[in-house]
């Protein structure tokens, strides 16, 4: 039985989304249990034999500073949910709340794995191969060293080995060009470290990739700092939304375009499903001594259920142990990288 702790109060919509999503998740996963964390009255919206309620008196808002969430709101639904993982009661925690607060609280309570300096946020983006490309970091670390990018690559490889059942996922380093001479000093040094990791057998490194390679499916994993990753994520969501809106507008122009829409509906529906970012909701916070997943703050029921599914799959497939094993195997490489003088 897999047990997930859910922050039911987080995100833009709170229990109006999280509780229906949890109900749907339970219907589809008979071997799962949920620990719902939130206000006592709010939690009454879902009573189930495989649900436990844990009352929390506070809520971390999307506007709360990290200091407020971490130091003052010690009985927040977000913190109490993560505490369930620390105490060994739950296999993973899920929240749609404030990203900065979630990362800070998770790092404070769970700590990082040996050999990992900073956790990273990783999620998937749809690609032209019919699958998805895993990208990290997506906002946890806006300033990264080359050593951090190497750590992200190691952890991302473990994640994709679970998501895609691949022993040797292909890693790419996001850059402004494929040539090794391209990029700033951090990217150039990261490229050197990743090539060394490939030679030692710790990684399957493709080389530099560009932004369009994320959606081509050139590699399985794209590594970047959190600033660039977050921009890429939000830009992709914006483009997908724009295309969906444009298609709807154009097919609604007159009776002929509406008839064309009816004929084209099966194809259009399949395309929009592939591009629907809700199907890829649920970002893993990698590098912690426990599993924590971040849902998009604006997630609807379908999207939040997807985040629950990702956390469930990660726990069922022992993601934490596989990340820990990858990091331990690469420990000499990571230690050597950290020992190198700063450029």
Curated annotation (Swiss-Prot):
Listed pathway(s): Lipid metabolism; phospholipid metabolism
Leader peptide range in chain numbering: none
One term under GO cellular component: cytoplasm
Repeat listed as a keyword: no
GO biological process: fatty acid biosynthetic process; phospholipid biosynthetic process
Disulfide bridge partners, by residue number: none
SUPFAM superfamilies, per the entry: Isocitrate/Isopropylmalate dehydrogenase-like
Class in the EC hierarchy, top level: transferase
Coiled coil: none
The organism's place on the tree of life at top rank: Bacteria
Catalytic activity, reaction form: a fatty acyl-[ACP] + phosphate = an acyl phosphate + holo-[ACP]
Gene Ontology molecular function terms on file: phosphate:acyl-[acyl carrier protein] acyltransferase activity
Pfam families (UniProt xref): FA_synthesis
Keywords: Cytoplasm, Lipid biosynthesis, Lipid metabolism, Phospholipid biosynthesis, Phospholipid metabolism, Transferase
EC number annotated for this UniProt entry: 2.3.1.274
Localization: Cytoplasm
Function statement: Catalyzes the reversible formation of acyl-phosphate (acyl-PO(4)) from acyl-[acyl-carrier-protein] (acyl-ACP). This enzyme utilizes acyl-ACP as fatty acyl donor, but not acyl-CoA.
Family in the record: Belongs to the PlsX family.
PANTHER family xrefs: FATTY ACID/PHOSPHOLIPID SYNTHESIS PROTEIN PLSX, PHOSPHATE ACYLTRANSFERASE
Subunit structure: Homodimer. Probably interacts with PlsY.
Protein name: Phosphate acyltransferase
